[in-house]
Amino acid sequence: MEQRALKHHRERLGEAIREEIGAILEGELGDPRIGLVTVSEVMIASNGKSAIVLVAVAGEEQEAVDTLEGLAAATGYIRHEVAARLGLRVAPELLFRLDQTERYGGRVEELLKRVNKRKKSSR
């Protein structure tokens, strides 16, 4: 039962961190490398010392690379702000990663369309 409570706590904390990082990214960072970005999910490690922040970046591959570089440069500021806003003594180390689900989802849709075309043409 204790583990379920800890897991629930990590999930709630991850959601709160996701919301705060989203607010910070909306207007507080002046880094021109950071493009149009959405925080998809924050996954807190079981020990609570680190968190993977999945971000979706609008645009081309190079824009995603530039945005991740900008986020890496601003990680200290973002971590400090998250800790202050949520009243955390120590915020987890933030590791920004590109969320690939949209790209994979688009690829799956494309493959399904091909399969459906083949089914229709074989009839």
Swiss-Prot record:
Q: Please tell me whether the keyword NADP is annotated for this protein.
A: no
Q: What is its main location?
A: cytoplasm
Q: Which domain of life does the protein's organism represent?
A: Bacteria
State the oligomer form and interacting partners: Monomer. Binds 30S ribosomal subunits, but not 50S ribosomal subunits or 70S ribosomes.
The family database entries (PROSITE patterns) matched by this protein are listed as: RBFA
Name a GO molecular-function annotation: ribosomal small subunit binding
Q: Which gene encodes it?
A: rbfA
One Pfam family cited in the UniProt record for this chain: RBFA
Q: List the GO terms this entry assigns under cellular component, sorted alphabetically.
A: cytosol
Q: Which organism is it from?
A: Koribacter versatilis (strain Ellin345)
Name this protein carries in UniProt: Ribosome-binding factor A
What family does the Swiss-Prot or TrEMBL record give for this protein? Belongs to the RbfA family.
Question: What does the UniProt entry say about where the protein is found?
Answer: Cytoplasm
**What this chain does, per the record?**
One of several proteins that assist in the late maturation steps of the functional core of the 30S ribosomal subunit. Associates with free 30S ribosomal subunits (but not with 30S subunits that are part of 70S ribosomes or polysomes). Required for efficient processing of 16S rRNA. May interact with the 5'-terminal helix region of 16S rRNA.
Gene Ontology biological process terms from the UniProt entry: maturation of SSU-rRNA
